[in-house]
Amino acid sequence: MNLNATLFAQMVVFLVLAWFTMKFVWPPLINALDERSKKIADGLAAAEKGKAELDAAHKRVDQELAQARNDGQQRIADAEKRAQAVAEEIKANAQAEAARIVAQAKAEAEQQIVKARETLRGEVAALAVKGAEQILKREVDQTAHAQLLNQLKAEL
């Protein structure tokens, strides 16, 4: 093996270059790689956290939508019950009003019947008195009596 001075010089230069690289070049590269891996890890952690928050938000939204649907259905059911109650109340009021109007009409009809009967009694009494007067004024024979009765029938 032939060793010459160039080989030793190259070895010394290589060792100086290796030492220089280890001392001045390698630490900034390692720091840059560490920072980059830390940023990537932080980004992944933030992405996981964001995904978890998004899932939680979706769950909250789904729960709130379900609650809103339930509330809406409950309000609709309550409104239907109130509408039915109001309709029943209106129906009951209308029936009561109709019964009152019918009773009032019956009372008025009864009053008119009573009034008509009283008027008829008065007229019949007046006609009877008038007929009796006419009978007493005339001579009482069979034909005159029949004519007076027919005339009274016609007036009635």
From Swiss-Prot:
Function (record text): F(1)F(0) ATP synthase produces ATP from ADP in the presence of a proton or sodium gradient. F-type ATPases consist of two structural domains, F(1) containing the extramembraneous catalytic core and F(0) containing the membrane proton channel, linked together by a central stalk and a peripheral stalk. During catalysis, ATP synthesis in the catalytic domain of F(1) is coupled via a rotary mechanism of the central stalk subunits to proton translocation. Component of the F(0) channel, it forms part of the peripheral stalk, linking F(1) to F(0).
Protein name in UniProt: ATP synthase subunit b
Predominant place of localization: membrane
TM ranges: 7-29
UniProt-recorded Gene Ontology molecular function terms: proton-transporting ATP synthase activity, rotational mechanism; proton-transporting ATPase activity, rotational mechanism
InterPro entries (UniProt xref): ATP_synth_B-like_membr_sf, ATP_synth_b/b'su_bac/chlpt, ATP_synth_F0_bsu_bac, ATP_synthase_B_chain
Gene name for this UniProt entry: atpF
Keyword annotations: ATP synthesis, Cell inner membrane, Cell membrane, CF(0), Hydrogen ion transport, Ion transport, Membrane, Transmembrane, Transmembrane helix, Transport
SUPFAM superfamilies: F1F0 ATP synthase subunit B, membrane domain (SSF81573)
